[in-house]
């Protein structure tokens, strides 16, 4: 009798826990759905597919081809984003509203794009590699100072950057590494016999190290005289201390 009563109590307690847990989960799901439905819809720049962007699979084998492709992807950005925003989105703080305070096209050059600062008789060639979710803009001032000191400077826009957030969705490190190789070949062709440097910031620093190591093994790649790493996005194992 006592065992039967205890068994019944345990069963009721178990069912109470199951029902309470199920109810809590159901309420949480309802709250989550209501919360998500109350959030703003994604804007056109969150959804656009800029299919002219460079990738390691692109049949581009020259820096001139890379720049031409970049021209096409920014034309796509104009047609599929700038021209498609709603009247309510045409504010002075929306970078995709033409002529707004934050529209990068207001300035010449557009520092969200690849830039090249040439010298008639440069002392060195310098490649600037920006970080992830960044653009050449972040290294523009350094590039201008190096150019004033006699360097031929190339500020590379990494694939998927400087356009729309969707550009980063399918981006792989191999795409950025391939773009780096094209830029270095171009810099070497433009500056024969002169030392070449890479300045990398954050992820750009990791790409600089990757390229420098690859150039040691692949004689077809232009060699780097020095690399400069700014806040490098590189993990160092504790074993390195020994």
Indicate where each model-derived feature is located.
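N-terminal targeting or regulatory segments adjacent to alpha/beta-hydrolase or S9 domains
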Residues: 2-105
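Short, surface-exposed "cap/lid" segments of acyl-processing enzymes
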Residues: 105-161
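Catalytic nucleophile-loop/oxyanion-hole region of alpha/beta-hydrolase
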Residues: 163-197
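Active-site signature of alpha/beta-hydrolase-fold catalytic machinery across serine-
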Residues: 210-214
